[in-house]
């Protein structure tokens, strides 16, 4: 597939699965052998389309108003695509082990995608989990003692 087609697959993920809340659309975007890496994953090293569906679903439930804003989608060498994005939402639902706080959260991220035959086969999320935990009040910001 061309670099533009790979970038289109990545954009579809953010538009249809994340912002469109259509988890079934993942079946057309991701390879069944998907390998998913994410720092706070409930299933580290998740495999298969259900891994990404489960992860996105957790954020939809925890942040019902969540929106993913994609700032850049860049094609790298061969089958690689990088997306720079921001996630925003209000923590109104439970995250695993974290009851709702009502806090508004903004998180910056980069995701590295690997595409094969027009589908995403690997996804590595690198996002500021510490900042999210600070915004939720779970971890104190630098210079503030925990209570």
What does each of the following model-derived ranges do?
Residues 1-147:
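C-terminal and inter-domain tail/linker signature
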């Amino acid at each position: 597939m061309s670099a533009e087609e790979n970038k289109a697959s990545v954009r579809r993920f953010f538009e249809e699965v994340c912002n469109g809340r259509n988890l079934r659309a993942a079946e057309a975007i991701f390879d069944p052998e998907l390998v998913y890496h994410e720092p706070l994953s409930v299933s580290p090293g998740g495999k298969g389309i259900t891994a990404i569906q489960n992860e996105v679903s957790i954020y939809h439930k925890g942040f019902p108003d969540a929106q993913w804003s994609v700032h850049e989608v860049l094609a790298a060498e061969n089958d690689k695509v990088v997306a720079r994005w921001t996630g925003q939402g209000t923590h109104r639902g439970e995250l695993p082990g974290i009851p709702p706080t009502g806090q508004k959260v903004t998180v910056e991220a980069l995701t590295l995608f690997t595409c094969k035959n027009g589908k995403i086969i690997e996804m590595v999320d690198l996002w500021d989990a510490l900042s999210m935990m600070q915004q939720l009040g779970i971890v104190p910001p630098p210079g503030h003692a925990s209570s």
